[in-house]
Curated annotation (Swiss-Prot):
Belongs to the autoinducer-2 exporter (AI-2E) (TC 2.A.86) family. Pfam families: AI-2E_transport. It is found in: Cell membrane. This is Putative transport protein TM_1187. Keywords: Cell membrane, Membrane, Transmembrane, Transmembrane helix, Transport. GO terms for biological process: transmembrane transport. It is a multi-pass membrane protein. The chain crosses the membrane at residues 12-32, 62-82, 105-125, 131-151, 190-210, 227-247, 252-272, 285-305. The lineage of its organism: Bacteria, Thermotogati, Thermotogota, Thermotogae, Thermotogales. One of its GO terms (cellular component) is plasma membrane.
Length: 324
């Protein structure tokens, strides 16, 4: 009976979380990203502890510096690269369009090319305006992400000490449920660190081999954005394709696309099934479907909460429906 009541409490917290995610997507997404970031810092610190024994706090400090510098480097370089390369792309499009005007081509084809060029320009301008409009929200979210990343360990300790308020009928059972769920999520993020390293190295070396500028930045960006399931490749694709096009023209678009597709397929068919699916003991296709469903329901935030939601749901079913 006590476990049954805990089941209701757990379900209530899940519903409350989803409602808040729908009503306040920026805040909840920022909190989840802060949680991701905290776990990443923990894993990097554990790795550094193998080589740095004393002082004990040093690996944690270095881990914080490395992770935040990586994110800052990617973020600071992202928009300047986009703006600079967009100008080159527009110039190239104008040059091609001017060249086509001197060629005797059918009127309908000329009209189509002009429409494509105009649509591309309008779409780019609209995207820039949307990004500018979201800047205040992005700043708030960034501050919240950093704060969350630093206080997660304190929050874990606080929840552990006050779990009897969350599950008053059977605190030990509730504590076991929360611990199992968080540990599995922690293992998943740890696995994602390995996947992201492989993807970042693949993209960075691919760009270097094909002489695409800013190969180091592209590799770092691919590493950072890989923590956004399935959408990260889209984010890293924008500067990669722009840089490839500005240097190699249309053949550069083909080269950039091949690098991105190869990295995506490597992750989807080799790395994710071996590392992530085995970590969660859930088939990768179920993970993909869950990401797509919650992404459709909660937009970008849904992509990030999909994995915590799936882990919570799996443990809820195992512990409270099937009886452990």
């Amino acid at each position: 009976m006590k476990n049954l009541k805990n089941k209701h409490f757990a379900l209530l917290y899940l519903v409350l979380f989803l409602v808040l995610a729908k009503l306040s997507p920026f805040i909840i997404t920022a909190l989840i990203m802060g949680l991701y970031l905290s776990i990443i810092i923990d894993y990097v610190a554990r790795f550094l502890e193998v080589f740095i024994k004393k002082p004990r706090v040093l690996p944690r400090v270095i881990s914080n510096v490395l992770v935040f510098l990586t994110i800052a480097y990617s973020a600071v370089n992202f928009f300047p690269v986009i703006v600079r390369e967009a100008q080159k792309v527009f110039s190239e499009i104008d040059r091609i369009r001017s060249g086509l005007e001197n060629i005797d081509i059918p009127g309908w084809l000329s009209s189509i090319l002009s429409s494509i060029s105009a649509s591309f320009s309008e779409g780019a301008l609209s995207l820039v305006n949307k990004i500018v409009g979201y800047v205040p929200s992005f700043i708030t979210a960034a501050i919240l992400i950093v704060i969350t990343a630093f206080i997660v360990s304190s929050l874990k300790r606080l929840i552990k000490e006050n779990v009897h308020y969350l599950f008053p009928t059977n605190p030990s059972d509730g504590k076991e449920f929360l611990k199992t769920t968080y540990t599995e999520f922690e293992r998943f993020v740890g696995g994602q660190v390995l996947v992201a390293i492989f993807v970042g190295l693949f993209v960075g070396f691919g760009a270097f081999i094909f002489k695409i500028p800013s190969a180091f930045f592209l590799g770092m960006l691919a590493f950072v954005t890989d923590f956004v399931p399935y959408l990260g490749v889209v984010i890293s694709a924008i500067p990669l394709l722009m840089l490839a096009f500005s240097v190699h023209g249309l053949s550069g678009l083909l080269i950039g696309t091949i690098i991105l597709v190869a990295a995506n397929q490597l992750e989807m068919w080799v790395l994710a099934p071996k590392i992530q699916s085995n970590t969660l003991n859930v088939h990768w296709f179920i993970i993909l479907i869950m990401i797509l469903i919650l992404g459709d329901l909660f937009s970008f935030g849904g992509v990030l909460i999909a994995l915590p939601f799936l882990i919570f749901l799996k443990n809820f079913w195992k512990q409270y429906v099937m009886g452990g």
